[in-house]
UniProtKB/Swiss-Prot annotation:
One of its GO terms (cellular component) is plasma membrane-derived thylakoid lumen. GO terms for molecular function: electron transfer activity; heme binding; iron ion binding. The keyword Lipid metabolism does not apply. NCBIfam families: Cytc6PetJCyano. The gene is petJ. Keywords: Electron transport, Heme, Iron, Metal-binding, Photosynthesis, Signal, Thylakoid, Transport. This is Cytochrome c6. It comes from Synechococcus elongatus (strain ATCC 33912 / PCC 7942 / FACHB-805).
């Protein structure tokens, strides 16, 4: 039993070693996608079209947008004044930019 548990823990450690760099790369790519496609309206987490609905954590929470799924849907399909990017960006691009937005909102858009 101890041998199986030890093997399982070792496998988990190896797996996690590969997951963390992939997530960092996804955030870096998400930042590039954001800069190229979103920053004109959302630079620094702001919203030039509707200043009341920013990408700040409190606003994302208030409007039910503080999840990968919600942001992915919004970016893919658009809503209101925000255009749809589903035909312009790949699913990976959209997932990466959604992760980037959530990460930045947690950091207060400080970097």
């Amino acid at each position: 039993m101890k041998r199986i548990l030890g093997t399982a823990i070792a496998a988990l450690v190896v797996l996690l070693a590969f997951i963390a760099p992939a997530q960092a790369a996804d955030l870096a790519h998400g930042g590039q996608v954001f800069s190229a496609n979103c920053a004109a309206c959302h630079l620094g987490g702001r919203n030039v079209v509707n200043p009341a609905k920013t990408l700040q954590k409190a606003d994302l929470d208030q409007y039910g947008m503080a999840s990968i799924e919600a942001i992915t849907t919004q970016v893919t399909n658009g809503k209101g004044a925000m255009p749809a990017f589903g035909s312009k960006l790949s699913a990976d691009d959209i997932a990466d930019v959604a992760s980037y937005v959530l990460d930045q909102s947690e950091k207060g858009w400080q970097g």
